[in-house]
Amino acid sequence: LIQEDLPFIKSENKINNKKIKFKLPSVDLLKIPTQKDKEKIRDDDYIDSEFLEKILLDFGVSGNIKKVSHGPVVTLNEFEPAAGVKVSKIINLSDDIARNTSSESARIATIPGRSTIGIELPNSSRENVYLSEIFSNNDFTKKDVRLPIALGKNISGIPVVGDLASMPHLLIAGTTGSGKSVCINTIILSLLYRHTPDKCKFILIDPKMLELSTYEGIPHLLCPVITEAKKAASVLGWVVKEMENRYRLMTKEGVRNIDSYNAKHILAMPYIVVVVDEMSDLMLVAGKEIENYIQKLSQMARAAGIHIIMATQRPSVDVITGTIKANFPTRISFQVTSKIDSRTILGEQGAEQLLGKGDMLYMSSANRIVRIHAPFVSDNEIEKVNNYLRSQAEPDYIDEILNFADEKELSGETSNSGDKDELYQAALDIIRSEGKASTSFLQRKLQIGYNRAARIID
């Protein structure tokens, strides 16, 4: 395998002159919070801790509230139950606590490493979380975080930044209006703010045709935004092929991962981030094929610098299969409709008690679940950033990706027709020799499905 033959190196040579001048976007393109936004929420917006203790006592649960943490959206009350009180008894009181405190919902969960139980109650007025605040934080600009993504603020109001390189893949679920699409936009913008087109490339798959089309034409794209589900399966096939090429190249160079390779070479191998906005649409069209590709990529692509971000609004078992779940240890759940959906995505209930509009539960690869409030980014802000990027460079699409998709479809059609002709002749021979002709007879003899046997009989 010759190094220069790899697609990412071919494209590097073409835009070599342009990449030197490339400037990363400024935080000024995003909305900066004003002093009014930063003002503290009034004290009467919170539930009094003594009142909460009294409510619990009315239900036969005695104990004390040890600590209260006021966040931008919810307040965390750390409750220490008296000896002999079961945790399950307190968790089952979530609906009663919400009713007695006149709250929209109440989430109760154990706090790892502490003897207290967290009771999360929503504030009567929500504080806005802006993307510019997270980008200005020191955690986002750290050099050792290779692919930083702005997740939002935790319950205490502290900015949370994740590293996609260590995740290494991300699964997002949530109903319509829960903030799922805004979260995908903040993740894409996070990477656009940190990496030039020669360091990080994107493949965007958007069967809904609306959410990711705004990124069309930015220089970070490897191919135009994919909107057809059949083409998406073929593009994922190309990503698998690219991963195998990278593995061969790294084996030849004697390195173990993309970072070691880039440390040895001037021509950096870019990260590839594949974003799939609606997984259920793809699973309907080509479920088994997509699942096989995603399984391959999620198991092996990390070392090759390829990462997948998948989102779905239907977190049922037929979309998020056991195979997909096993290979996506890092997951985000926004508000879902039922406890069953919450268990499917996180393995425990609680996501049905979320408030919507960016309120999420983040499960890291260590299986710790943290409540985070995702930042809001408007369409206007996204468009400003995209226009700034488009003004600096043209996208350098790799034709091989779309050609790969077209070739695969053509070869699929020819092979299907070839199979049919071959079986048709075999079916004729069997019918002549046996003197019988029926669909079920052909199914048994040729070991094929009902539909195919019926077509041959017709």
Mark where each language-model region is.
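Conserved alpha/beta core segments of nucleic-acid transaction machinery
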Residues: 364-458
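Low-complexity, intrinsically disordered P/S/T-rich segments
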Residues: 1-162, 166-169
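Aromatic/hydrophobic pocket-lining residues that form π-stacking "cages" and hydrophobic walls in ligand
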Residues: 52, 294-297, 427
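Short, intrinsically disordered, mixed-charge
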Residues: 54-58, 95-103, 189, 193, ...
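P-loop NTPase catalytic phosphate-binding loop
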Residues: 18-25, 111-120, 139-256, 264, ...
